Amino acid sequence: MKGIAFVGKSWLILTVAGLTFSQVLAQETKSGIPLDQSWKETVYAFAANNLQHTAWGLEHSERDYQLARALAAGDGLEIDEDVLFAAAFLHDMAAFEPYAVAGEDHSNTGADKAGAILEPAGFPMAKLPSVQAAIRAHMYYAEVPAEPVAQVLHDADTLNFLGAIGVTRIISLTTREGLAKDLPAAVATLENFSRELPASLVTATAKAMATDRVQEMESFLAALRQQSVDGRAL
């Protein structure tokens, strides 16, 4: 805690582990997601302490949650907020040690292991199958069930590979992951994503958003080609 001050009846803002004091008092995440149940506080703390990464860490989960809610609203879908919160903040847990299993898709492994985090946190475990279904379906290549939370989380996660945020995420992986082992590989991944990912979207709202995000990526890639001797000097 860096400092705290009380002036009259007003608290001054301070920073506590990356959160402002006003957020701590309001019990919300950095992006304003309410932590209105104790199990949510526990799950969020787990993600903050264990799932840090430039491309699929805590902030990515916050974006997925917020965007999934917007997609549900846009398509008029009723979603279970508990299921969405749990799935959004745990969907990539098996991309991290010690939860990863070599040779297994992190979506399936994460779905299998999510209960071990949720049950001691006090999550309503009758909803676990829906959380697991959403986690299994979150990747762009996954088959998506008819459950609304699975659909909007899948689309939110896919949209997060497109647009300016998609470019930022993939470039951040350069030299660290196979899909971006160097800059030319990162650019090839971005080109493939801009062409192929929109077709995997389910909701009408996501499909509409994808149009703008693909245009953003194509503009970036065109400028990059122009500034790198048609990509030969990356």
Summary of predicted features, one role per range:
Residues 47-51, 72, 93-101, 118, ...:
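Short amphipathic alpha-helical interaction patches enriched in hydrophobic/aromatic residues
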Residues 10-22:
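Bacterial N-terminal signal peptides
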Residues 64, 106-119:
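An active-site-proximal "capping" alpha-helix that borders the catalytic cofactor pocket
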Residues 33-34, 50-62, 66-78, 90, ...:
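Divalent metal-dependent phosphate-bond-processing catalytic cores, especially two-metal-ion Mg2+/Mn2+ enzymes
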Residues 81-100, 106, 110, 130-139:
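His-Asp-centered metal-binding catalytic motifs of divalent-metal-dependent phosphohydrolases/nucleases
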